[in-house]
Structures are given as structure tokens and as C-alpha cells.
Amino acid sequence: MFAQLDTKSVYSFMDSVVDLNTYVKRAKELGYQSIGLMDRDNLYAAYHFAQLAIRNGLRPLIGTEANLFYEGRKIPFRLLAKNNQGYKNLMKLATELSSGQREFTYFSDYLNDIALILPSEDWEPGMSLGSEVFIGVRPEDAGKEFDYPVVPLHTVRYFENADRSTIQTLHAISQNVSLSEVSICPMNQLLFSAKEMEEAYSKLPEALNNLNQLVSDVSYQFDTNLKLPRFNREMTAVD
């Protein structure tokens, strides 16, 4: 069964129109059993999302997108917490991100119980990233060879392609530029059905198998000790 990992919510500042209630409701209608949330550089929606998913009979997959510098290149790594300790490590990582830390090597001690996913377009041969590492692939990556196991990585930022204009407007506002200066928002970053996604990745069966194994290893036990990272009110907004 396909699991949607890389979904951005409205908590990804000016970069998504996905609200949690609609996301969970639609995911259930579209045949998902496991769904993820990977907001950019924060976990502010994580606990609420997880509780909402559980109440609707879905397995929550908690992660984040962290833009880190690896050998001078800025890479949007995806990080997935596999258990409570992984979730706590993600919270520590998010706190460091809010303080301005961006060097990949700095976070080596934070990656225990976390699956690291590198988008295929950012992969280069010989990259040394750690032990539990995957390459996030698109359907068009079929036939390519990578140094690490592959998993499907489909980004969701909106529910309809018509919402792309809203995303572009948000980007223009956040960048303080005119709409004509903003890069065109990619097509089809929407929530397809689980069946449609399995069909899209039919030429990458190893990616689907790896995804199923990865998701089956994810488990959280939520209690009052699992709290959210606080906003750093002294930090100014950065890209």
C-alpha cells in the first residue's frame, strides 16, 4: 500500500494551502492507510496531525524538510522519525534550525532513529550521509542507479492544480517581489489516490517495497511528554 510521505501543510510558511483536516479526510477517502507530514524546517503541526490521523484510523508519519548545507550545497533533506526517540531528535533538530544552524555535519548526532531521504535530483555519486539513508525518487527515475536504497518521494502542496496560482501569490508575498518574478509552481503537487501512486511507480517496484518496509517500522507512543518545539521569537524570517 502506497504511503504519502512528503506533504507540506499551511505550517510551511507561504508554501502550501493544505490544511490538516482536509488532508486527513481526503487521504482516507483516497485509500491511504499511512500518511506523512514534512513541513519545511518545523514540527509545529506534527502532534495535532498525528492525533488527527490516528482518530481517523490512519498511521501518521512525522517528518520535516530541512534545508542543510552539504559540502557547500544547500539540499532539502527529508527526515522521517521512526519512533518516539526519532521524534524527540527531530524536535532538537528543529530547534537548532530555528537558531540558524544549517551545516549537515553538525546534525550527525541528531539522526538516530530517523530515516534520511535525499531527493534524487540532489544526489551525487559518493555522498556519505550515514546509515539509514534513502534516495527519494520520481517515476521518471526508473532505470537510474543510486548508491542508496530508493523510496517514492511525491510532494503535496495543494489539492487542485488550480491552487497553483495561490501558491505563486504566496511565494511573491514571501519574497517581496512581483508575481511575474516568481518561479512557476510545479504541476501535480496534489494528493492522488494510493492506487494512482502505485501505478505511477509500477516501474520502480523496489521503491514501493522499500517504502512499505520503512513505514512498517514506524511507531509512536504519544503521551504528554511529547511536546512541540517553541517558536524562537527573536529570530527574523529567513529563506
Sequence positions of predicted segments:
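Helix C-cap/helix->beta junction micro-motif
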Residues: 56, 146-148
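Active-site glycine-centered loops adjacent to acidic/histidine catalytic or metal-binding residues
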Residues: 39, 155
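N-terminal beta1-alpha1-beta2 module of alpha/beta enzyme domains
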Residues: 13
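Conserved active-site carboxylates
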Residues: 1-10, 19, 23-34, 67-136, ...
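Glycine-rich loop at the start of a catalytic domain that most often binds anionic cofactors/ligands
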Residues: 43-58, 164-168
